[in-house]
Every structure is written in structure tokens, then in C-alpha cells.
Amino acid sequence: MISILHTADWHLGQSFFGYDRTDEHLHFLDWLCDTIRQHEVDVLIIAGDVFDVSNPSAASQRMFYRFVSRVTTENPALQLVVVAGNHDSAARLEAPLPLLQEMRTEIKGVVPKREGKPLYDDLIVELKNARGEVEALCLAVPFLRQGDYVVPEGAENTYAAGVRMFYQELVQCAALRQTEIQALVAVGHL
């Protein structure tokens, strides 16, 4: 059975009322590496807000990329799935994707589109167990911004209705790929 560890809202680079939280973040990342190794986690999910601001410092970015390098080196079968949150710059988060994919890391920062319509299939990530078998499909949805979703006519709460419709259509797309033994894991930053 696949083992998944879900995290979110790391806010690397944050200061709290003038207090620099770098040491806290470093301790958290060390703890997370140890936990992943001890529990033989197959997939680490980061559901948005990796960074505290859309233009994170070089030190914050270095902290994140060192973590990715370390955790994937120490755990050769580990997959990472990262979605952008409202604090993250979607494009900045996706920029090093070709390098990160070499470390079994998928990042979904923006909703890919063709002719204005979401390419739902591009938001689906296969999750594999330690034997390399696909046990689940991850519906990896970054923070949805206006323009990422269609608002149904007559919707009272346009954001809620649009997001609901987006997820419904994504699930329908995933169901076409899903086998009877694969789970669906929906991940988003709302």
C-alpha cells in the first residue's frame, strides 16, 4: 500500500512580527526528512505556500531546493508533488521543473490551458508505491485564480461554484485514466 505524507503552508522565508523563522524552518525540514525515512513514505505532497512571498529570497529558495535534493537522495523511491499556493509565484515555482523532475518532483504552479480551456490531464500525477506500481492518481491543483475556471451562470458565490465545477471536470477526466485498483487523491490550495 502506498504511503502518502501531506503537508502545506510552509511559508519559507517568513518573519513573524520581526522574528526571523529560518531556524524553525530548518528544524522542520530536518524533522520532515527524518519522518519520511522512518515511515518509508512513498509520496510527499506540499499543498501550496511553499514560500511566504511571491518573490522569495535566494536563501529561502536555496533552503527549499537543498531540502528537495536531500530528501530525494536519502529516499531513492520518494516522489514529491507540489502545488502553488496563493503566496507562491506560480511561474517562479515551476521555473526549475526540468531539473526537479530528475529528482522525482512534480510542480503544478499554473493551470495549463489550450484555447482558454484547462488541460485537466496535465494536472494528473501518477503516484507510485515502492515497487514502482501506480497505486493512485493525484489531482494536483494549484491555487485557482480568476480565469482558471468557468463560472456557471446564475452562481451566487462565483468562486465556490467555479472551483466546484473545475474539480468536477478534473475528476471526470481522471476517471477516464483510473483503473479499478487506483485511488484518486485530490490536492489543492483553497
Write out the residue ranges for each language-model feature.
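A short helix->loop->beta-strand "cap" motif at the edges of active sites that frequently abuts
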Residues: 73-79, 182
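Metal-dependent catalytic neighborhoods of phosphoester/phosphodiester hydrolases
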Residues: 17, 50-68, 84-103, 108-109, ...
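Cofactor- and metal-binding active-site motifs of prokaryotic enzymes
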Residues: 54, 74-75, 83, 120-123, ...
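Surface-exposed alpha-helical segments enriched in charged/polar residues
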Residues: 33-37, 69, 73, 98, ...
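His/Asp/Glu-rich metal-coordinating catalytic cores
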Residues: 88-190
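Active-site neighborhood of phospho(di)ester-bond hydrolases with catalytic His/Asp-centered motifs
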Residues: 7-8, 44-48, 79-86, 108-111, ...
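N-terminal active-site segment of His-dependent metallophosphoesterases
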Residues: 1-69, 76-77
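Generic signature of intrinsically disordered, low-complexity segments enriched in small/polar residues
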Residues: 19-22, 31, 67-70, 146, ...
